[in-house]
Amino acid sequence: MPHFRSNGLDMFYELHGQGEPMLLVHGFSGTGQDHWQHQIPVFSERYRLIAPDVRGHGRTDHPETITGPPFFELATSDLVGLVSSLGLGPVHVCGFSMGSSLATCLYYARPSLVKSLVLVSGAARINREVGGGLFELWQRLGNPDAISPGWAKRLAALHGEQRWQVLLQNYSRAVIARFSQDEAILYRDAGEIRCPTLIVQGGRDLVSPTVLSEELHASIPDSELVILDCEHWVPGLRPQEFNEVVLDFLDRHFPAENPL
């Protein structure tokens, strides 16, 4: 299985299919295979997929603590290095939840590497006004004893019995640090995005409320917003609709990549 050495850790990734490159960035507590399980078989028929496990997740190394640059900066640097090392850029970038934040951070860090953005179940900003309940949730998740036995079992299966608690604690600290910033904005430069951008949102999402995707849509010039009837994990809850929406978006903006 391929690994890429980045910022002192070994980053696991998978490659699937042939065609124009597409980077799939999973969300918190998932893996590339887990969160994109319904997309990889379909998208790989037309695209060269890069599906990494973000630092601290799955088969990528789990740092014991987050030191130096914050989590999002390190994870973004990992993705820039991975795409550059494979020589596959520019890439279409599809990010879910936390992965949508990393997708936009990748654009800000290296816009020449990004051909298009698909931002799924993300948020234009995170603050106490809109997401106060989420802030309290992430504070509680810093204590692994606060989560349900069912989720603990799932995390152990995905990330290892000895590593999932470190994952929770690290990401909890990273999110709380973001909340603590004065501007508390993940997509602080959304108005500067100039590549084709699709935003996909679950209409019943309580993790990232619809109003936040609407704000993001209003901030990104010429972006498109599609709201599907489901909760947070849109790629898994509405896989057929989601796949059709994404492929239609790419076909319209890049018709030469998939000539009929």
What are the residue ranges of the model-derived segments?
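Active-site glycine-rich loops that stabilize anionic/oxyanionic intermediates
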Residues: 19, 27-31, 97
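The serine-hydrolase catalytic nucleophile loop
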Residues: 28-40
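Short beta-strand/loop motif that positions the catalytic acidic residue
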Residues: 193, 199-201
